[in-house]
Amino acid sequence: MSDGDADPAAASPSPSTSTSSTSASGAPPVPASGPLSSGPLSSVPAQVRRTVAGATAAPADAELTVVVLAPTDPMTRGQLRRMADLARDEGYRVRWEEARGGPTAPFATIGGLSGLLRRADRVVMGDPFSRYVQLLLTITRARDLVVVDDGTATMEFVAQLARGERLVRWHRKGGRPGPRDLLFAPVSSSARRRLTPSARRRVEVFSSMPVHETPDGVTVTANDFSWTRARFGPPRITKGADMVGTSLVETGVVDGDSYLEAVRTLAKAHGTTRYFAHRRESTEKLHRLAKETGLEIVRPDLPLELIARRGPIGRTILSFPSTVVHTLPLALAGTGVRVAVCDIDPTWLTENASPRAQGFLSGVTGTARDVHRLTSVSLA
């Protein structure tokens, strides 16, 4: 149940939980009646924003609690603190749980949330691959389950659910399950069953990511970022270009030297001056990038979609395959900002990369270009 750093499935950097009853266009629908309690949201600060975005349409008398299962990573903790403040400013109750504060912390957290989860009519969750989230799912009796993770993992989650497969992150290697996987298998299987619609349970996915394989009975609601656009901006647009970083090196998918060369080449070709670091990028790698490319490294204290809406932001935003090639065009719609994506060359992949990595990453950029008409960027 505790997060092992070597286990990406368990180490979701900021599982947070939320209870929200949300409705209207671009947001999960409100249940007909009944109070709302809390449920597992999950890993990224942006998921708090998505929950708040959907919750703005909830009935005035709905009881809504956002529960943050605090991570240990300082960068993600900082972003979550800011997002928690934003949720409070919007009028929602926020409960901060030090869920990873020692060997007994998970037991205290689960015990403290059990009553809330059992009473919940609706549970809104983020990363369904998180073992913490899967464990909390076994407690709730909610009739409505909503997944609000707009990350690329959403695409894989929905596809695996449709095919009846076990939930495995795309960047993890295949093969036989390890001892921890076998130990946790009953919980994971239970969570997968609960995320399968039935006569007693409705399941919805609230996401801006493209969903091509929809499981029977699952409702897919598009997040068009209308709340983000209404709440922030419009931004001041600068003449230069900005680049969005990725943690593909940290997750063992892309070779570090190849990534550095790609960043250097793109920055020189497009006059890039700033590099918005992913919250999981290592300090050592960022120092090297700054030294060898001359880029200004920016560590955002809010999700990038909010940073971009607040501005200033470059007229061109360069990115590698990631969630932002889908979300930034929505958040910045009507501003004239161009989002350009550089595919990952197969030669950049490490020997430890999952066999599925190249196909999955190509799918992320390919669907984004089709949907949002992004401009592809290739290295000379």
Predicted regions and their residues:
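Conserved catalytic-core segment of nucleotide-activated headgroup transferases in glycan assembly
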Residues: 241-281
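Short beta-strand scaffold positions
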Residues: 125, 277, 319-320
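Short acidic, S/G/P-rich loop/turn micro-motifs used as interaction or catalytic elements
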Residues: 43-47, 72-75, 129-132, 152-154, ...
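Donor nucleotide-activated moiety binding/catalytic core segment of transferases
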Residues: 283-326
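A nucleotide-sugar donor-handling region in carbohydrate enzymes
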Residues: 156-242
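Active-site and donor-binding regions of nucleotide-sugar-utilizing enzymes
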Residues: 1-11, 32-175
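Leloir-type glycosyltransferase catalytic cores
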Residues: 351-380
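Actinobacteria-biased recognition of intrinsically disordered, low-complexity terminal regions
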Residues: 4-42, 369-380
